[in-house]
Every structure is written in C-alpha cells, then in structure tokens.
Amino acid sequence: SCSLVGSEMCIRDRNNCVLIDAPADPDYILGEIESHGLTLKKIFLTHGHFDHIGAVADLVDRTGCEVYIHIMDKPKLTDDAGMLANLFRIRGHRNYTGKVNVFTEDDILKLDELEFDVLETPGHTSGSVCFICGMNMFSGDTLFSRSVGRTDMPDGSSTALMKSLMKIADLGGNLTVYPGHMNVTTLDAERKYNPYLRQAADCLLYTSPSPRD
C-alpha cells in the first residue's frame, strides 16, 4: 500500500517504507511516516535539486536510512550551485555528506520484497530518473500532469528530455504517475492530454523502423 507524504510517495512493505525524494521538511515527513506506523529504511532520489533533497541529511541523522541517487546527480548532494540552492538563494539548508548508494538504469532497487525498475530520463538534470514499481511510476521532475520539467537551468537539456519522453511514451500499460510536483495522473491521460508526451509519441512513429514487406 502507498502513503502520501506531501508531494512525495512513501511505499510500504510490511512496516518498512521508502521515501521517493525528500523535500525540506523532515519533521512533517517523519510525522506522516510515524502516523502510518512505518519505519523509514531508504530514500530514493529522482534527481539532485534542493527541493527534492533538502531533508536528506536530517532524515538520515534521525532514522539511519539509506540514500540512493543516480551516479550523474550524486555531486549535487554537496554542491549548492548544482542543486540550485544558489540560484534560488536558499539559505540554512544542510548538505548531505554521508554514505550514498549510486545506481544506473541497469540496477533494480529493492525494499524488502518490493522492486523498483530505474528508467534513466535525463533532461531536467543529467541524472534524472523515474522509478517504476508495479503499475506505479514516480516521475520526479521529468513528467508532470499536462506538463514536463524545466530544461533551462544548469545541467538541463531539451533534446535529452525529448528523448526521455519518447522512452516514457513507449512504456506499456496505464501506469499511475506520481510526479514530483502537481497532481497524480496516469500515463494514458498524459498520452492523450500532455502536449509534450504527445509530441514524443509522434516522434516515435517517425523514428520506428518500417515493417518489412
């Protein structure tokens, strides 16, 4: 079962849970986790911007949980410029300098019996990913309801994002999509109403090999 923690998702297996992204309010996050009788074991980060990693240091200090991030975004955990804290003039945050587990698309992340496939989706950042667990996708700042993440900031790339959206458009099934911001949606709804994902789907049609006669 799933428990909503702010705009992030807490995935439960037995009484353990994994937090997908950790915005800067550890007291609220822990309060929500404790109210559901859960124990935080791991944090999976979709990318390394401050509004997704701000509570990591405090949560690790208070729970001993493990931290996972894509290898390309690991440097952002300790780089104020890379995490955009300088750009948005964020003050008083704690950088996380402890142990980090890095992954790539070749890895499967686990919490007890739950398995999370990693879909590399660079564009918003070079190390942006989506996590897929069963029929649920946690899309970070790659895919939103009717929109997508910005690419006009350092380490962003509109070309890379379009390629990532093509990967998402090519996924099978009507996944429930939990974005890093805005409302929960579904992959079918985004295929129909999201102009960026529709463009990506059109690109797939033009780039797919023609069937042989």
Language model segments and positions:
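Residue-level detector of beta-strand structural context in well-folded domains
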Residues: 7-8, 101, 106-107, 129, ...
